[in-house]
Curated annotation (Swiss-Prot):
Catalyzes the GTP-dependent ribosomal translocation step during translation elongation. During this step, the ribosome changes from the pre-translocational (PRE) to the post-translocational (POST) state as the newly formed A-site-bound peptidyl-tRNA and P-site-bound deacylated tRNA move to the P and E sites, respectively. Catalyzes the coordinated movement of the two tRNA molecules, the mRNA and conformational changes in the ribosome. It comes from the Bacteria. GTP binds at residues 17-24, 88-92, 142-145. One of its GO terms (biological process) is ribosome disassembly. This is Elongation factor G. GO terms for molecular function: GTP binding; GTPase activity; guanosine tetraphosphate binding; translation elongation factor activity.
Amino acid sequence: MARKTPLNRYRNIGICAHVDAGKTTTTERILFYTGVSHKIGEVHDGAATMDWMEQEQERGITITSAATTTFWQGMDQQYDQHRINIIDTPGHVDFTIEVERSLRVLDGAVVVFCGSSGVEPQSETVWRQANKYEVPRIVFVNKMDRAGADFDSVCNQIRKRLGASVVPIQYNIGAEDNFKGVVDLIRMKAIFWNEEDMGMTYEEKDIPDDIKDRCDELREQMTEAAAEGSEELMEKYLEEGDLSNDEIKAGLRQQVLANEIVLGLCGSAFKNKGVQALLDAVIEFLPAPDEVKAIQGVLPDGETVEARKSSDDEPFSALAFKIATDPFVGSLTFIRVYSGVLNSGDSVLNSVREKKERVGRLLQMHANSREEIKEVLAGDIAACVGMKDVTTGDTLCDLKNPIVLERMEFPEPVISVAVEPKSKADQEKMGLALGRLAQEDPSFRVKTDEETGQTIISGMGELHLDILVDRMRREFKVEANIGAPQVAYRETFTRGADVDGKFVKQSGGRGQYGHVKVKFEPIDRDEEFQFEEQIHGGSVPKEYFGAVQKGIDEQLQAGVLAGYPILGVKATLYDGSYHEVDSNENAFRMAGALAVKNAAKEAGAVLLEPIMKVEAVTPEDYMGDVMGDLNRRRGIVQGMEDTMAGKIIRAEVPLSEMFGYATDLRSMSQGRASYSMEFLKYAEAPKNIADEVISGKKS
């Protein structure tokens, strides 16, 4: 089937922002103006179309990134029809994994900021992730009708705190209650949207006198930024002192695609002002799939790197970036197609797991409705029904042309809780539900505690686990009791050790005999366990090296102080002895494990605790209380800053001290302070804390 929309008219974009910047409302308005949804869903009423999980509507935050396809021809129908695939991303820090996944498969992003609170801590996280994946972006300063809204100030904050070169291509006419519309700095026209028909129509007028000078100044800066797009433009600009509107657009587009600049737009999604102009900017300045770098993958030999161009003629390759459980069709695998064509009914290879998968139905998703399609082409984002063994981050590709597209990296969980089913009936359902949730979300882990038999779930924060337990109840009808949160401590060796590990059982008949000499040394904690052997003269036969390594590795995972995995260790097997008859793999595995236990004292084993990077935003009146409280929690304040949103306090605080912080912070600031927290590093726990944890584990 021929393409309905040529590839150069595709835009795969994400809309990302801080929690309350108005991202879902902005997306809603986009759906409204592109004609997809007839009644605008308001987040305030818990009715937004993109937020389709019950919980999101209750909490008013977006948790799962729903993918939506819309079409747009411009405010004046001035373009050919473009197809815009939008991924709505969550802004809460416990869900950064979702944002990371989405950014991985996008070609461009719209970053929404609140006109009155500006750059908030979460915005920095999202910005860093977008930098990591080199995503070209434009900025939409929303809520210009709010008290304290100031477009210039937000642009300055983005320059200062995010280090981005912001070039405004619009300017606001009035602000707060007097916010009337925006000036298009390229055409130098003032645009006023009609409030009677929810902004569907608008009129253009001359720029109001009171902001004319400021607009001239900004246009000059914008033209200069556009001139840097190419040498020809720069020459013309230097000769004539100006560029045509088309040249300005071409120059700005070059600069945005090269990630040299970020364009600044403004409006109020809630008041229906500025969203259509934002859509025009998406078409005008964000890249089509064939304008971004071709995706690179590794061939089956594990070494050869190959690029796959965004074209229907290349072999099929796609990345599964999200797994979702849908109440009607079961498991949905969202894929971004990078190259080639896929028809429903085709078989593909999951090259990460080396398994063949058959594609059942293919669905084009709107936020909570779906249309069945027969094929997907390069550049498309769609959902497949009925995939068995696909996890987030897997590559799906042509059976004859296997390739592994780059893996996404997922952080290790930092917090765990025990969950117990309330009844026997819940027991079986719980296993199934947890398996499903873990498949959807790679930052969520499930394991069984071998000593207690309890099921332990781990995730990125309290809210993350709350929501997963809540989903278990709603979607899978599993009732469970939740234990107190547990911190994911780790252990490490602080110095080298040279030890024996000897496992001998000889009491007549076939015995067990394994003896090793191992040197342990600390390495960087972020590195994987390293194992070397330097056996000379066959004191330990070659066939037992693997068993020794396995024994050491297993004991490192099990820990020596309090049962937590040991990080940053290199082990060198350099000597030992064996018995012709009694030695076997098991004996050498046990000997390896004993070597780790014996090394604990000599190697100075210590307990490590996770340290979180905490950013609290508070009105000045409560600053003393918030600081004092962070100090009591063993926090080390790293710095403070004044912003539009209030004072920002940056601190490093042990995770174990942060439980219940959200509630405490609310009560000490009468609900006006907020915070974000993400994992920073592991650091040695103070002796009194370590002793408590170790004795707690052993009691």
